[in-house]
Amino acid sequence: MRNGLILGALAAVVITQAGCGTQVKSVALQPSVQQPAAGSGVALYFGSQTHPAVQQQLGEASVSARVARAQDGADASCDKALEQALDKLRAAAQEKKANAVINVQTRFHSAETSSSTNFTCGVSPSAAAVAVHGDLAVLQSN
């Protein structure tokens, strides 16, 4: 009887925890994320995307964001997490007087993307998260 209760309790825990893991996704970048945010003047260049000549390197910046998962789906939640992370990245660039962040990479834990078309995001039933890294730079203006 006692063994049956223990096995039943263990089975209940396993069933409730099934499917609760975080999924690492590759999500398409929206074209709007690369444009300077209103008032920031900081452009973003993902991966090896071409950009104007670098006048000055100002170091690196790494930021992350985690948002509650909304009802509109995993990709939309990842987009919101990326938007928040990029806002933080732009703020770090402004603080150092940079007008761009180049070589932008995204990651979730050890899964990293250096792409100009996709980004990496971790999404669970409750949240979405992304980390962003890039080189702060002053680019020549045209």
Please state what every model-predicted region is.
Residues 29-52:
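Post-signal peptide N-terminal segment of mature Sec-exported envelope proteins
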Residues 15-19:
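C-terminal motif of bacterial Sec signal peptides marking the signal peptidase cleavage site
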Residues 49-55, 92-101, 139-142:
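A short, structured loop/turn motif at beta-sheet edges
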Residues 21-23:
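Bacterial signal peptide processing site
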Residues 124-142:
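C-terminal edge-of-domain segments
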Residues 1-8:
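Bacterial N-terminal signal peptides that target proteins for export
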Residues 112-124:
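Charged, often glycine-rich, active-site loop that binds/positions anionic groups
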Residues 63-112:
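Short, well-ordered alpha-helical segments
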